[in-house]
Amino acid sequence: MRWSHFVIISCLGVGATGIAQAAPQFTVGDMPSFFQGSFGTNSTLNIFYNDTYFQYQNSTLRLKLEVPYLSVSGLPNGASLSGGSVVSRKGAPTQTHSASGFGDVWLAAHYTVLQSSGLMPAIVPFAKIKFGTASASQGLGTGRNDYEIGMGLDETIGARIFPFAHIAYRFVGNPPGDNLQNIWTYNIGSSYLVNEHNVLTGMFDGAQSEQPGYSGPADLVVAWNYNVTRAGSGFQLYFDKGLSNGSPDFGIGIGGQVVF
């Protein structure tokens, strides 16, 4: 899991009304979110994460840039946020602090090599880079880049059901002394087109832990999109329920996007 995954889920829901469109689309959106939980520490963290994103998409290519701002309280001294979880955790209780600032910038490229046809899902390899732009000294990030490659399967069942599954391998940037490990990430779910305005999405999202000896994140996510225009401009709401000790207890986000 990572915080901005929920923006991606929202885009999947919106995209269900216009899969494989030939006309290029540009999207600008913003998704403020709030998460609360221990994330495997001895403290309760409160995280506000505001993700502003820019996307270009045509029939085969999707490019996306995410520029987040975040604020956290209850973060144990010496620990850092990384990829939607907390690393450099210590077993013993420790003092905590609060911090705010720009987060790690993400750049992603998805390319559809095979469109969905009948029982054959669309095959969509992808690559992502997490630039270590968040402050490592404040614990807002590790200060290191991550690199991720993966494969997505996106299916169409009738005119209303859009199952999807994605798996990826992330090469995790390792600050000195942290001993972080590379991880697998994965999700599976489906969007349901209720009508031309409303899209519902449910998803299980998980990953291995970047820090050995701790639980990886595992989350159940439900999302609702309301499309104001046929192109996909509209509003997005999601709720997250953490299922592991490495996840938040809960998360919620509401935002919107404009598609040109």
For each of these PLM feature ranges, what is it?
Residues 22-174, 181, 185-251, 255:
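Transmembrane beta-barrel domains of Gram-negative outer membranes and organellar outer membranes
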Residues 1-25:
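Cleavable N-terminal export/targeting peptides
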Residues 258-260:
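Flexible, glycine-rich linker and terminal segments associated
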